[in-house]
Regions:
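Acidic, PIN/NYN-like endoribonuclease modules and their adjacent C-terminal/linker elements
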Residues: 1-2, 105, 109-138
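A generic structural signal for short hydrophobic patches within well-formed alpha-helices
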Residues: 12, 52, 122-123
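Short, flexible helix/strand-to-coil boundary loops that buttress conserved ligand/catalytic motifs
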Residues: 16-17, 59, 92, 126-129
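A short, hydrophobic/aromatic-rich structural module that often spans a beta strand
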Residues: 51-84
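Phosphate- and divalent-cation-binding pockets in alpha/beta enzyme and binding domains
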Residues: 54-55, 87, 124-125
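Active-site neighborhoods of divalent-metal-dependent phosphate/nucleic-acid chemistry enzymes
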Residues: 76-114, 118
C-alpha cells in the first residue's frame, strides 16, 4: 500500500524559508529531504483545505503554488468534513490546542495518513494520530 503523508503548515514554512532550529539545525533541509524521499517512493502528500487557508495567511497564492510545484504529481487534496470540523472544535476546547491542529490530527487518523509536524501541540493529540518530525522519517 502506498504511504500518504499530511505535512503540517510549519513544515512547509521550514522549507520555503529554509529555517534553522534553536541550535542551528537545518529544519528546511530536513523537511525538503523528506519530501524528496516521499516523491522518490511514489508516495503521496495530502493537502487539506485548512492547510491552504493557513498558508494563505502567510504567503501569496503564487508563492504557495510555487511551494507545491515540484510535488504536484504526488499531491492529493482532502476537504475536511463538517463532522471532522465539529470534532476538532470540541477537542481543541477540551485540550487547549488550536482547532486547526486538532483537525489535522483527525484528518490523519480518518485517512490513515502519516502526520509530519514539529508543533508541540500535537503531543496533546497523540491518542488521535501519532506524529513525526521530518528528521525521524528521512
Amino acid at each position: 500500500m502506498t504511504e500518504e503523508y499530511i505535512i503540517d503548515t510549519s513544515i512547509w514554512v521550514d522549507i520555503y524559508e529554509d529555517r534553522k532550529g534553536y541550535n542551528d539545525e537545518p529544519l528546511g533541509d530536513y523537511a525538503f529531504k523528506l519530501l524528496v524521499k516521499i516523491k522518490a517512493k511514489e508516495s503521496f502528500i495530502v493537502l487539506t483545505d485548512f492547510l491552504i487557508k493557513e498558508l494563505e495567511t502567510i504567503y501569496s497564492v503564487e508563492e504557495i503554488n510555487g511551494m507545491f510545484k515540484s510535488f504536484e504529481k504526488i499531491i492529493k487534496k482532502v476537504i475536511a468534513t463538517e463532522k471532522q470540523r465539529e470534532e476538532a472544535k470540541k477537542i481543541a476546547k477540551e485540550r487547549d490546542v488550536p482547532a486547526g491542529d486538532a483537525l489535522h490530527a483527525i484528518v490523519a487518523r480518518d485517512n490513515g495518513l502519516i502526520l509530519v509536524t514539529r508543533d508541540g501541540h500535537f503531543r496533546k493529540l497523540e491518542d488521535i494520530s501519532k506524529h513525526y518530525k521530518p528528521e525521524e522519517l528521512i
